[in-house]
């Protein structure tokens, strides 16, 4: 099978792709402009089927549908590696958790 045929055989719609997500899973969204809005919307549509799904993003400009559709955080918890302005506002509302990505040595006294 050539690469293009193999690639086409693996293509899925966002709704088909998020069927793989189970309770308790971690899902990683990509960073910034690579944010997957169609996948995010498809995952948000499964809100009532899922519990304790944790999602990590990074510099997402917003909106993040899994956060907006579940302000009680009964189904999804959203974490960010580095806050965009939108994610900082989510943090201020208690709807986003910051994951410390980088630590550097602190000066000794």
Cite the ranges covered by each PLM segment:
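HKD-type phospholipase D/PLD-like phosphodiesterase module
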Residues: 70-100
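Short, charged beta->alpha transition segments
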Residues: 14-15, 86-87, 104
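Conserved small/polar residues in nucleotide/adenosyl-binding loops
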Residues: 102-109
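N-terminal active-site beta-alpha-beta segment that forms phosphate/nucleotide-binding
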Residues: 2-82
């Amino acid at each position: 099978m050539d690469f293009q045929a193999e690639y086409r055989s693996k293509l899925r719609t966002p709704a088909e792709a998020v069927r793989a997500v189970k309770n308790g899973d971690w899902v990683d969204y990509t960073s910034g402009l690579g944010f997957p809005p169609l996948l995010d919307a498809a995952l948000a549509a499964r809100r009532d089927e899922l519990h304790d799904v944790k999602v990590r993003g990074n510099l997402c400009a917003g909106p993040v549908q899994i956060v907006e559709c579940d302000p009680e955080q009964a189904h999804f918890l959203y974490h960010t590696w580095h806050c965009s302005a939108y994610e900082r506002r989510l943090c201020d509302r208690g709807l986003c958790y910051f994951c410390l990505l980088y630590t550097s040595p602190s000066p000794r006294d």
